[in-house]
Amino acid sequence: MAAVTQAEDSSITPELSVDALLKLANVVRFRIYVALRAFGTLRARQLAELTGITETSMNRHLDVMREVGFVVAEQAGKTRQSWLWSAVPGGVRVGRIEGGEIQDAALEWLRAVSGAYGIIASQWPSVAASWPQNWQSAAETSDWVMHLTAQQLDGLAADLRAVATKWKQASKINEPALAEQTVTPEDPDWIAPVVLILTAIPYPSRPR
């Protein structure tokens, strides 16, 4: 299995085990993880609204994710409803894996990642019209079908990561202002979480 990274540039990454991967291999849990990375600190109620599940179910998912070390809770009040949840820095990292139970678990996790990002991407067309025109114009959904060697695909992936890394630096500059911004979405200086999904894979099957 080729190296896969879903991570911030940080050394704070919990150790992955078969058990941890299987517990993270859940579409809802990965959507929770993406939401926390996008918005920072949220309560279970807010996460439940973003993912379309009940707050009770959300708390169960958060408990599992906290058990394997990928979310943390700040107990900001006496009741659980007031707890503030955040994703740990470091992301979820899956390196080069060869065979065995860990590979099977990693594949399950990758399927959950693909499913979660598919849901997020599919939500944009339904809400795009409610966004200001400049954001509608800036949003990008494109696809290409290419014919490449494995070495060329490796080069393409490296180029895409380099471009993403460049803009991640801009994101880090913006992040301190995100929580305190007072401008509205119509203002050109407004900052929003942006999800970039990179998938460059061989077509999964071949005609017989």
Regions inferred by a protein language model and the residue ranges of each:
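Short, cationic-aromatic polyanion-contact patches
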Residues: 20-28, 43, 76-99
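Residues within the helices of the helix-turn-helix
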Residues: 34, 44-45
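Short, hydrophobic-biased segments on the C-terminal half of alpha helices
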Residues: 62-63
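Amphipathic alpha-helical dimerization/coiled-coil segments
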Residues: 86-146
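Charged, low-complexity intrinsically disordered regulatory/assembly segments
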Residues: 130-208
